[in-house]
Design a protein with these regions (language model features):
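C-terminal lobe/tail of nucleotide-utilizing enzymes
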Residues: 92-180
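Signal for well-folded cores of large energy- and translation-related assemblies
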Residues: 36-43, 59, 66-70, 96, ...
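Nucleotide-state-sensitive switch-loop elements of NTP-binding domains
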Residues: 1-49, 58, 71-73
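Inter-motif core of Ras-like GTPase G domains
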Residues: 62-82
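Glycine-rich phosphate-binding loops of nucleotide-dependent enzymes
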Residues: 12, 35, 54, 67, ...
Length: 184
């Protein structure tokens, strides 16, 4: 399988292989098979870093990946609600038990910025991931706001930092509270 070059990255996804109208009803063995196929059958070529976007939770997908590949680290992404932070906490605990360094926690949908008046509204709460990171003694890596421009650029297939580098949305990624990662 050949990865698709996208903005200087090599990408592959189950979504690229299955019709968008087809339901993905997979049990653990099918998920594990897909992960194994992506790791062994995709012609990645030389890589500095392999980023794997995983579904939330602590199930078969995460365990399969940890068994197949020596991971340099994991970044946990969570929204600020208490219920989401429970999953984030479980994820941190799972990676630590499996001896995978947790590189940090990111808060997604940290706040909504009204495109008309610029007022920030904390729809899902705010700061929960930062507090959780502190409690778990892992680095807090930053916040991603809920902005229409980020969604629109994603739908267009162009990163917001490329399509509108000076925008508030782009600056959330480039000038925000982000902490650069150093891999172990």
């Amino acid at each position: 399988l050949q990865p698709v070059p996208v903005w200087g990255l090599k990408a592959v996804s189950i979504g690229m292989l299955v019709d968008e109208k087809q339901a993905m009803i997979w049990r653990g063995p099918m998920v594990m098979g897909a992960i194994n196929q992506f790791l062994t059958d995709v012609d990645w070529g030389p890589l500095d870093v392999l980023v794997v976007d995983m579904p939330p939770g602590t199930g078969d997908a995460q365990l399969s990946l940890m068994q197949k590949v020596p991971l340099a680290g994991a970044v946990i992404v969570s929204t600020p609600q208490d219920i989401a932070l429970i999953d984030a906490r479980r994820g941190v605990t799972m990676f630590e038990k499996m001896k995978v360094p947790v590189l940090g926690l990111i808060e997604n949908m940290s706040y909504f910025c009204c495109p008309n008046c610029g007022h920030n509204t904390e729809l899902f709460g705010h700061g929960g991931a930062r507090k959780e990171a502190e409690a778990l003694h892992v680095p807090f890596l930053g916040e991603v706001p809920l902005l229409a421009a980020i969604r629109a650029s994603g739908d267009d297939g162009t990163p917001i930092v490329a399509s509108a580098p000076e925008s508030e949305a782009a600056q959330a990624f480039t000038h925000g509270s982000y902490t650069p990662l150093t891999l172990p």
